[in-house]
Amino acid sequence: LALFLGLVFSFYSISAFAQIRDAEIAKDDQNGQWLSYGRTHNETRFAPFEDINDSNVQELGVEWYIDLPNDVGLVSTPLVVDGILYFVGTMNIVRAVDAVSGEILWTYNPRVAEEIAGKKKVGWVHNRGLTFYGDKVYGATWDGRLFALNHKTGEEAWITRTFSIDTPLYITGTPKAFKGKVVIGNGGTENGPTRGFITAYDAETGEEAWKFYIVPGNPADGFENAAMEMAAETWTGDWWKNGGGGNAWHGFTYDAEMDALYIGTGNGAPWNASIRSPDGGDNLFLSSVLALDPDTGEYLWHYQTTPGETWDYNSNMDIVLTDLEIAGSTVKALLHAPKNGFFYVLNRENGELISAEKYAEANWASHIDMATGRPVENQGARFNNNTKITPGPLGAHSWHPMSYNPSTGLVYIPTIHWGVQYNDEGYDGEFTSNDFEPNLAVDWTEDLDYEISGSLQAWDPVGQRQIWEVGYDHMYNAGTLTTAGNLVFQGTAEGSLMAYDASNGQTLWKKDLGLGISAPPISYKIDNQQYLSILVGWGGGGAAGLDRDGSTLGWAYGRHTRRLITFSLGGDNEIPSQPAPSFPEPLVDTGFQIDPNLAILGETAFANNFCGGCHGTAAIPAGMAPDLRASPILLDQQAFYSIVRDGALVSRAMPSHPDITDDELESIRHYIRQQAINAQRQ
């Protein structure tokens, strides 16, 4: 009888839950929920709630918070479905939380550390989010698995591998669910000879439905479809030997009106187009907005933002859909602000360019020719004479999502202001490992004349002009949320959650959260109460130390607690204070005799094994991993070898490098010790 009653209760509990399908995701109100990465299929990140508004936002207080002491970089967008908040943290661990009280209901650990042990060298700890469809939560792991979870219990409904773990590919992106399917892509363009693709799976069973490759393969093997045959005409040389790239690691939008799936595609592999495709060519479908049939994966149309891409100007940024009034007509518009510094408005019915203007510094091209839809490149932009180019490879806008407010008609873009020096001297055209290899000489450590900064700008997509801008001292600030309360929310690299007047950019509220913020906020309503939630945990490329900017913030590894924080009007809880920003003191041991020749070799070994991907370029970290210059582990040869080669700290997201040699390990030790001395001298 007890078993029978339990089954009956379970049946009625599950039946009471209204499954989430495309119609629910498409609704503006969504009954107060946040059902998808960009809230609706249109990816606007607009919350149509006005309880919290420009007249009372200063009354926001902490409703509840959760400490996440074992997490590192937090960059994901939470979901809120039926009163439960779902989010993904470090190493793809998923948690379900009561969205009103903050109580953790269940945790799912896909055990990424164990999966990648001895197989993957680059230990990314980030993921940008989950998706919800039907009655399941979907996520993906860095090592390439796609999973579906029971939304009530967190138990696996199914899990499947989307690529071999032995390839250079990885996943940091959010799956996209629509029409009974779940789509996922992958990254890895810089990690080896990759040929990007996206795959759709049956949402109920996990069975593969279709796959679309983004660049053509070896013509001798035949082409998968007519689109690949067409694309191959735009490549030269033996491009397939280096893969070609194009990886779709982010930027999926489903258009229910057009019944189309839009994919933002990646940059070339290797970066340098003169090596990748020596006799020129546009190299389709790199750096493009690609429209596919959502049922079959068949090609519909494309628009390429950067033909013959060579600067890491991918188009993986979010794709936003809306209707715009242009010249007296309603246009079904697609809005896109990729890395290359131009803001594009496309007609999503056919992919035709409506307008394009610079939204940031971009000296690689003068303008977009409206007759051809192509950029007009400036002389010397393609690595000539160590040219300094804007934007740099991190782009004028990265993955940090922009938002669109239909009331103001404005797009709110987290913008990066930065340039680097490109050249192709000393280029090595061979990928040597599954580690990060841009394969062109971009000196990330060189001090350039360009200032590094960031900004939030409000952009008019109809007039193609900036309406207002707020400047920041640092470039890697978080994605945005805009609301019907005439507000724009954004977290900053310096650790503040900001609320701005959506119309004029006036600062209305500021809350110091004690740690750099990389994740975008969300808003939801339960029982007529509006909430604002955000993950606080400095992450992404800024925290990895890929550039010098992040290392100046003082978010030292292990000192600052990561958190999920939820606010409400009149919230009266207090979050514990965080330590002040700090910079670990480099450890100098006079008993360690540095061999200068080994240190020189160690610089190369440090780069080739992508140690800098977590510990910072030139061993100058930015918070995602310990400062090795201050670590006593470097003084203990056996302990250092055990961690780096044998994986003694795999459970803490430090990957093992089983193939690294004693000579490489020793040279890295000497290089880091040399960097410690150099830091002390400064």
Mark where each language-model region is.
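Sequence/structural segment immediately N-terminal to covalent heme-attachment motifs in c-type
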Residues: I594-T617, S642-D646
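C-terminal capping alpha-helices of c-type cytochrome domains
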Residues: A140, H151, L598, H657-Q682
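Repeat-blade elements of multi-bladed beta-propeller folds
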Residues: W34-G38, D71-I93, K119-L146, Y170-N191, ...
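Blade/loop signatures of beta-propeller domains
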Residues: I20-V62, N218-M228, R374-E377, T445, ...
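Blade-level signature of beta-propeller repeat domains, shared across WD40, Kelch, NHL, RCC1
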Residues: I522-S582
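Extracytoplasmic beta-rich repeat domains
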Residues: I66-T77, T107-T131, E156-T174, Y213-G251, ...
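Gly/Gly-Pro-rich "capping" loops immediately C-terminal to redox-active cysteine motifs
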Residues: G616-L649, A653-S656
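Short, conserved, GDST-rich strand-edge loop motifs in beta-rich repeat architectures
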Residues: I184-G196, T236, I263-N283, H417-D449, ...
